[in-house]
Structure formats: C-alpha cells, structure tokens
C-alpha cells in the first residue's frame, strides 16, 4: 500500500472522476495554490492524473461597467427622442457624449441633420430595439453574439481573459493508498526517541514549480542595472556579452596574468568540474599569448591549464574577447555581468557580485583620457565625490583604484582601471591603438547611491525593505539622468 501525504490522499478521495481543482479546494477548505505541490507530487508518483485547459471568458472593463449601468451613449441619445406625428427627434445639444453616440449610430446608417437626429417612427423603433438588445448583451458579455462581442472589445468595453484551469482525477483505487504524517524536517529529539521511524520522510523534488507571487514593486537592483546600461549606451558605448563559465585563458592568460599568480589559486577562483562543451580560443592567440608569457614571465606556459574551466572572476574576460575579435580601430564597448570569487560574506564583500567592465580603443589615448572617461561615467551615475589612488594590476600600467564616498562606510573602493599593457594588446593583434580599461563593482555603487550599508541587502527578500529601497531608487533616478541634477548623499 502506498503511503501519501494527507492533502494528496484527500485530493484523490474527492476526485474519483475528472474535477476542477478549484472545486476540490473548496470542498477541502483550502486554496488551489496550497494544493498544487501535492497535485504535482501525485502526478509524478502516478497516483493522480492532471490536465490543464485554457478557458476563455469575457469581463467588463471599468468603462464597460459604467455603460452597462448608465446606458450606451447612442442608446441614451435615441431614448431621449420625442416622437410626434410619425417623426422622432433627438437634440444633440442635450448630450455631452453626442459625438461618441453619432459615431456609433453612423454604423447603423443614422446621420444628424444640423443639431438634431430625426428618424421616422418605424425606423426609430427598429434601431432602439437593436440597441436595447446590445445593451442587454453588454450586461452579460459571455452570451453576447460574436459580432457584438467583437464591437465591445474594439470599443474597450469588454476584455478577453484567458485562464488555465487544472483538472484532476484519481489514477489509483482509494483502497491502494493511505494517508500518513509526512515530515520534511526531523529534529534531534525525533532521532533520539526513535519517533522518526513512524514518519514518512518527504523527498524534495526540485522539478516541481512553486506558486508565483507577484512582487509589490519592481526589484530596485534590477532597475539600477538597467539604468547603468542606459547610461553607458547614452555615452556612446556598445554592449557585449560573454559566458559565465570561462576558460582560464580569457579570464587570466590573455590578461598577462602569470599561471602561478596567487589570484589563480583555489582560494581566489572557483574551479569547475565540467565535461560539457567549452569554446576553445583560436590557435594563433593561444600561441602568441603563450609566447609572451614565456618571454616576459620566464616560465614554461601550460596550455592545458589555460583551458581549465572556471567561473569568471572578472568581466574583463568578456571585454578582452571583444578586443581580440575586433583588433585595432576606434571603438568603445562595455559589459555588465555576474562574477564569482571565494569571498567571506560580510557587509562589504560577497562571493557573487556584478561588474561593469569597459574598454575604449583608439590611437593616441593617454592616462588623462582614462581619468576623464571614468569621471564622466561616475558623474553620469550621480557620484559627486570620487577619487583615484595609484594601484598595481598585472594587465594595466599605469593603474588606479577608484573610490566613492558612502555616508556610513566612508570611502569605498568600487573598481580598478588602467591602460592595457603591450603584453596584453600585442598578442591579440592590437598594435596601433591604446586601450583604456576598467572594471567597477556595481553592487558597491548601488550601495553608495542608495545609502545601503550591507551588500546582502541588495538581495533581501523582505517585502517592506524592497519597497523602501525601490522608493530610494525612484528618488535617485528622478535626481539624475536627463534632468541633469547630480545626486549627493
């Protein structure tokens, strides 16, 4: 005999034949959402048959409800007519919606004469009878004739609604199953007393989709990322994208980062066991990059190591791909994406965060151009207090760290920048141009601009906090961008 959770057993008991799940939920005093996971479990176990049907129905819009209660404009106009000696006359000046009424009466062949609508009494009664039927149809749109329903939809008096109805039916006789107390969690006391032996332990099925609950507001951090994208495109940059699962070549080697560099150890990089397909870098780039490593760093470059899969630690892996593909010239590209590092989670650090990476390529570019470009982007995002400090990065020279001021955390580093070294650009075929490059942590920038002092709050599930942070985001966006006002904390 199969042991089932009590809710699933009750569904089977109440649905010996096909029955809407809504009806079963009413009988059980429950809701469809709370029963859905048991329905999916029953389907997966083969004890419940499930069908989904899309049902169409029609409902009145707000204007439709008003017209159903007060009358259609054309109906009200003709009902106000006065009939004498076989002629019926309605005065347009008495009706504020006369133009709407006339537009719909014109489809019935009725035209005004001056400021009145005049019809012979027989025609008048015939048209009024038609409009009365239409008025009745508006009160019950589900039974309206197709051509009338089509008109109501066009006039935005009625809208079509599609709803997925779930039907269930028991797939096994009731006597072959029995209910039992099902546990998803057991305590140390359950184990010590042996009570766990009397429980049915429910396995977790990650393929079952949970019910969806609409968010009260858009997620502020997603809105922020989209806004950064708009800012960069507005400054003349083109967006490029790359994979999250990278080979070490693009993440490190192409950036002139030696294969024994500490950042390439397991405490700074997530290495991935992966047997699926991975894009191999072009052979000529592998050879030229390996040769530069051996000449400059003076070690034997390991081709096999360069092809190890890693979770990218920097979105520079994507911009360096774009540089290798496009070569010399004049262009500006950027990318926004997630990067991963084995960090300890605290208010300032996370093992998964977002970066804005960009490059500007062209002849004659200097360090002044770089600082000017960085300041332009920072101001476009509303950061009024920015400073630069000299820094070292393996793949840029000269290099700087970029800081912005947070009201509680003080000066917060959110990115690095520099000019790509010849050891980076020349193996990729870039020999006539200089390349300005930077990578910024967007999570920290969002914290600075929105006054958030803990990076974990960017992913909070607290609905009240989401509303609060969205309100801050709305105030921030209203203060920058097209308006031109800089946001100062």
From Swiss-Prot:
Its EC number is 6.1.1.20. GO terms for molecular function: ATP binding; magnesium ion binding; phenylalanine-tRNA ligase activity; tRNA binding. SUPFAM superfamilies: Class II aaRS and biotin synthetases. One of its GO terms (cellular component) is cytoplasm. Its main location: cytoplasm. GO terms for biological process: phenylalanyl-tRNA aminoacylation. Signal peptide: none annotated. It catalyses: tRNA(Phe) + L-phenylalanine + ATP = L-phenylalanyl-tRNA(Phe) + AMP + diphosphate + H(+). CDD domains: PheRS_alpha_core (cd00496). Keywords: Aminoacyl-tRNA synthetase, ATP-binding, Cytoplasm, Ligase, Magnesium, Metal-binding, Nucleotide-binding, Protein biosynthesis. It is an enzyme of class 6 (ligase). Disulfide bonds: none annotated. InterPro entries: aa-tRNA-synth_II (IPR006195), aa-tRNA-synth_II/BPL/LPL (IPR045864), Phe-tRNA-synth_IIc_asu (IPR004529), Phe_tRNA_ligase_alpha_bac/arc (IPR022917), Phenylalanyl-tRNA_Synthase (IPR002319). It holds the Pfam family tRNA-synt_2d. The keyword Protease does not apply. It is found in: Cytoplasm. Its cofactor is Mg(2+). Belongs to the class-II aminoacyl-tRNA synthetase family. Phe-tRNA synthetase alpha subunit type 2 subfamily. Tetramer of two alpha and two beta subunits. This is Phenylalanine--tRNA ligase alpha subunit. It comes from Pyrobaculum aerophilum (strain ATCC 51768 / DSM 7523 / JCM 9630 / CIP 104966 / NBRC 100827 / IM2). The lineage of its organism: Archaea, Thermoproteota, Thermoprotei, Thermoproteales, Thermoproteaceae. The gene is pheS.
